[in-house]
Amino acid sequence: GLIGIACTAAKPMVAPAGAKEAFFGTNPISFAWPRKGSAPIVFDMATSTLAMGDVQIAARDGHAVPPGTGLGPDGNPSDDPKEIIKGVLLPFGGYKGSAISLMVELLSAGLTGDNFSYEAGAKDNNDEGPPKGGELIIAINPTLVAGNEWSDHSELFLTKLKNMDRVRIPGERRHKNRLDQGPRFINKEMLEKVKRLLE
């Protein structure tokens, strides 16, 4: 298997650290690490405090979001997801997350010649489809880089990590949940929307 790294510039909805207007996208980063005999390590994360989809779910379900998630349209901090949707998200980790968002912009748009988030926003046709932001995808053959022992060496590291108290490997719970064939629960509002779509 190959190691995968990807990042994407998206429609602007995140204010850089210290700013009050959107300039960065949520600029997700994805990572995948192959493992022999185990599910691969896979994670993806927005570089904002929450993904916009999570904010939209909180708004739909009437829940507040954690403090520091975003600013309302007045530029003031808010835990009301409906206000944040009208305002901006904030980068995770303050200026450090803002620097990672900057890195994603430069790698996915500056390096590839594709659209930065602000360009994707300006060119978006608002059809609810994905914006035309830049994307960088990297695939690495670990055997070519580290030799045949890369897997055993990495598994030793992961075993030591897992043996620490209350530590989980990213993607472990999600993979276990995907194997679960039990019943699923859908909130009432979502069920009603699905029923309306079927009419």
Where are these regions (language model features)?
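Secondary-shell segments that build the walls of catalytic and ion/ligand-binding clefts
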Residues: 53, 60-116, 123
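Glycine-rich beta-alpha junction loops
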Residues: 47-50, 96, 142-144
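Catalytic-core signal marking the mid-to-C-terminal active-site face
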Residues: 111, 116-199
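Phosphate/diphosphate-binding glycine-rich loops and adjacent basic-rich segments that engage nucleotide
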Residues: 13-82
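Short, ordered loop/turn segments at secondary-structure junctions
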Residues: 9-10
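N-terminal nucleophile
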Residues: 22-28, 46, 99-125, 130-133
